[in-house]
Amino acid sequence: DGVVITKYPNNGLKTEGNYVNGVRNGEWAEYWEEVWWYDYGEDGEANTRDTLENNNRWDSVEVIIPNFKPKLKTQGNYLNGNRDGTWTEYFEDGKRKTELNYTSGKFNGLQSYWNPNGNKIEEKNYIDGKQQGLRTTYFEETGIKKEETYFKDGVQQGLWVEWFNDGQNKRERFFTDGERDLSLI
């Protein structure tokens, strides 16, 4: 029990969090692996021949170890070994990738997803692990709404609308218990 820290083979911080009674409990974080490399030469590029070096050979070795601050990869809370509350995942550049909400290890609440450019690509809601209510997807390049549909107890239900990437309506369909009823457009 207590704080546990794990590290990558290069000794960079990998995870940190708390255990209570042998299970994860409280805030946990996972970090991206830090990059360390060797430079053979004066140009700062690994494995290249440098014109300023003697006889154009790899005759010097430098170890470059940047002063990294660990970059978050994933962060959230555990309660009795289960994910609980908001969990956020990040791209390596620090931008948000996902925000997922949990209760006792099950999706519960709004789930949001972004692409590497920062555009939201999907948003959906869950209640007790089942998709419930509105689900919206967006075009990755523009962030313009692409599709919208509804779910009840994890099954597609009601109107489904799809748009072109210029925002114009493409088609609409109606679903009952996950089955398409008819094409409206």
Question: Positions of the model-derived regions?
Answer:
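Glycine/tyrosine- and acidic-biased, solvent-exposed loop/turn segments at the edges of beta-strands
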Residues: 1-44, 51-185
